[in-house]
């Protein structure tokens, strides 16, 4: 590592180091970590978070079974509060949790190879257990709400047990969801009960609220699992850059020094949450948010209401709070980062610190840009300086930096505008067809059902994001698309798709989306032999519910393109028009299946001729 980079690296992380030293000093004051976490969270919250932790590791265990493990840990915590010098009180809390899991009787009978994790030493033991977590598993049913005529009475008679069952159910179904989020959802559910139990139709009231809560839980779970995936795959520095951009956009009035401290603190908390250390995750998240609330005048006036909420509700509220308005008098960055003759001297003297401040300054001026776009802009600017600062006339070399950076902006703006215009002008059905055509051509190896699922996710993103104002549309679109792409790349690791996908997935984090957008037809793909059975037509095309008919037609479209990914838009239209005419004709006949048998055979012959596919 260059000395310059090392020195600037130390400078950049000095605030984080001081914070970490403070944390170690704080922990050193407590001989027992479990005791001080228990004291911080108090009994009810500690119990709830312990239940979340066990439910996320042991997803098949019953509530009663996990309650015994929670009791063991709470008993130990209370013992350690009374006497921190007790021998078993000095262990790290995550080790205490995993030791408890490894003492479960017949662990292997229920969890098979997961039991082998117990033979490993920490932290490998925890990594092993994490690898066995199953997101939204088939063997776990969604939360089953008690009947409307008894739910209010059950809640009133035994609130703690009632909410405990809710927390348990959500945690085991969402094993990567952070504890603060789960407790926030439990509070939302409790508020819904308190409101709906006053209504004449309790069930209808709860149904409406539950739909919103389920969608919210699913969305937050997907995002948090994605954050953990980014941390694991790309490491601290990429995640740090993401956080710096996001927090600079959200709190543009806060000085760089304070935003940097918050970034470093948040990385530590996210790592705890991603590692399954939910008690530490909850405690340190609460402390971080309390620190933020104590500096509202520095960060934002938008979090005032959140900071007045109980600690269990505060974290999620702050995360969902609106961006603060950027200061009106921010000067242009051109003078400092392009026109200044000393740019190279500043860049070379403290590379990381210089780039971090550039990212902060650029981000706080552009809350309308996506995180990924700003990362591409920063990388483009950094690469330009690395090249230009080696020349005899650096200023002349980087004089057109603004134009080069604008290319990144235009590419992203054009992608968003093109897709939102398509959705607006033609509607969701045609938008989905367009997505399926594009991505089947890019990835014809992907199973039909998975392509349809991916297309639906992208259509949902379009519907959600394109209705937003220009100030949020890009960030919303590319943010969610990056999650879909990350999921595709994760699948690519275990089930390779093709060389183009592999190449895009190996790109820098911020370049993945443009790579997927620019990806062309997979020319190496060899279609399977034409099988007429894949294009069977029957009376369901007439009688099935509209949604089912639409799904069937989309699958036919995907399977058709898989036969020849190079087909043109004109060829697709010709075949689609033929299909529509066939359905219109046959659905009016008395013997529908006979008609489909004859007309379907003709359509297949015509389609093969259109595509130039031999017999």
Curated annotation (Swiss-Prot):
One GO process term, biological-process aspect: negative regulation of mitochondrial depolarization
Tissue: Plasma.
Binding residue positions for Ca(2+) 1: 33, 272, 277, 280
SMART domains hit by this protein: ALBUMIN (SM00103)
Glycosylation sites: 500
Binding site for Cu cation: 30
Binding residues for Zn(2+): 277
Pfam families cross-referenced by the UniProt entry: Serum_albumin
Subcellular compartments: Secreted
Superkingdom of the organism of origin: Eukaryota
Gene Ontology molecular function: DNA binding; fatty acid binding; metal ion binding; pyridoxal phosphate binding; small molecule binding; toxic substance binding
Segments forming domain Albumin: 22-214, 215-407, 408-605
PROSITE patterns hit by this protein: ALBUMIN_1, ALBUMIN_2
Keywords associated with the record: Allergen, Calcium, Copper, Disulfide bond, Glycoprotein, Lipid-binding, Metal-binding, Repeat, Secreted, Signal, Zinc
Binding site residues for Ca(2+) 2: 40, 283
Coiled coil region boundaries: none
SUPFAM superfamilies tied to this protein: Serum albumin-like
Position of the signal peptide: 1-18
Protein task: Binds water, Ca(2+), Na(+), K(+), fatty acids, hormones, bilirubin and drugs. Its main function is the regulation of the colloidal osmotic pressure of blood.
Family classification: Belongs to the ALB/AFP/VDB family.
Protein name: Albumin
Taxonomic source organism: Gallus gallus (Chicken)
């Amino acid at each position: 590592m260059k000395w310059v980079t090392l020195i600037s690296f130390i400078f950049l992380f000095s605030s984080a180091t001081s914070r970490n030293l403070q944390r170690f000093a704080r922990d050193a004051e407590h001989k027992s970590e479990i005791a001080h976490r228990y004291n911080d969270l108090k009994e009810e919250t500690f119990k709830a978070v312990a239940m979340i932790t066990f439910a996320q590791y042991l997803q098949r265990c019953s509530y009663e079974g996990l309650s015994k493990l929670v009791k063991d840990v709470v008993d130990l915590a209370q013992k350690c509060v009374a006497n921190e010098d007790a021998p078993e009180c000095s262990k790290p809390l995550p080790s205490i949790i995993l030791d408890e899991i490894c003492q479960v009787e017949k662990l292997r009978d229920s969890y098979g190879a997961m039991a082998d994790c117990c033979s490993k030493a920490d932290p490998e033991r925890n990594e092993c257990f994490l690898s066995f977590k199953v997101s939204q598993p088939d063997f776990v049913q969604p939360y089953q709400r008690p009947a409307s005529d008894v739910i209010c009475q059950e809640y009133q008679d035994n609130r703690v047990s009632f909410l405990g069952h809710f927390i348990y159910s959500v945690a085991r179904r969402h094993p990567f969801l952070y504890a603060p989020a789960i407790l926030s959802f439990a509070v939302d559910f409790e508020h819904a009960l308190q409101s709906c139990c006053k209504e004449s139709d309790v069930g209808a009231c709860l149904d409406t609220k539950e739909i919103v809560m389920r969608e919210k839980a699913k969305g937050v779970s997907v995002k948090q699992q994605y954050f953990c995936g980014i941390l694991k795959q790309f490491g601290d520095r990429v995640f740090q850059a993401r956080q710096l951009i996001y927090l600079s956009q959200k709190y543009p009035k806060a000085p760089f020094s304070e935003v940097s401290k918050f970034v470093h603190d948040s990385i530590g908390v996210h790592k705890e949450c991603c590692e399954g250390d939910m008690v530490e995750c909850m405690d340190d998240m609460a402390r971080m948010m309390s620190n933020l609330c104590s500096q509202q005048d520095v960060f934002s006036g938008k979090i005032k209401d959140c900071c007045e909420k109980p600690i269990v509700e505060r974290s999620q509220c702050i995360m969902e709070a609106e961006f603060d308005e950027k200061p009106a008098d921010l000067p242009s960055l051109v003078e400092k980062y392009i026109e200044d003759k000393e740019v190279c001297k500043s860049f070379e003297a403290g590379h990381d610190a210089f780039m971090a401040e550039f990212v902060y300054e650029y981000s706080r001026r552009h809350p309308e840009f996506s995180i990924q776009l700003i990362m591409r802009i920063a990388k483009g600017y950094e690469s330009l300086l690395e090249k230009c600062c080696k020349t005899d006339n650096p200023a002349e070399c980087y004089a057109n930096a603004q134009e080069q950076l604008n290319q990144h902006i235009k590419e992203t703006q054009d992608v968003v505008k093109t897709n939102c215009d398509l959705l607006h002008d033609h509607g969701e059905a045609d938008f989905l067809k367009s997505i399926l055509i594009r991505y089947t051509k890019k990835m014809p190896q992907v199973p039909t059902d998975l392509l349809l699922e991916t297309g639906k996710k992208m259509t949902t993103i379009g519907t959600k994001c394109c209705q937003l104002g220009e100030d949020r549309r890009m960030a919303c679109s590319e943010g969610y698309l990056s999650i879909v792409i990350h999921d595709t790349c994760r699948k690519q690791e275990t089930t390779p798709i093709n060389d183009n996908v592999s190449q895009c997935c190996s790109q820098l984090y911020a370049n993945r989306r443009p790579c997927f957008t620019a990806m062309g037809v997979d020319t190496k793909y060899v279609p399977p032999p034409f099988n007429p059975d894949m294009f069977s037509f029957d009376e369901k095309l007439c009688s099935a519910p509209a949604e089912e008919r639409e799904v069937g037609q989309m699958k036919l479209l995907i399977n058709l393109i898989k036969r020849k990914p190079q087909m043109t838009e004109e060829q697709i239209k010709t075949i689609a028009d033929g299909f529509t005419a066939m359905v219109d004709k046959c659905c009016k006949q008395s013997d529908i299946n006979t008609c489909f048998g004859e007309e379907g055979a003709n359509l297949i012959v015509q389609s093969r001729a259109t595509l130039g596919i031999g017999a």
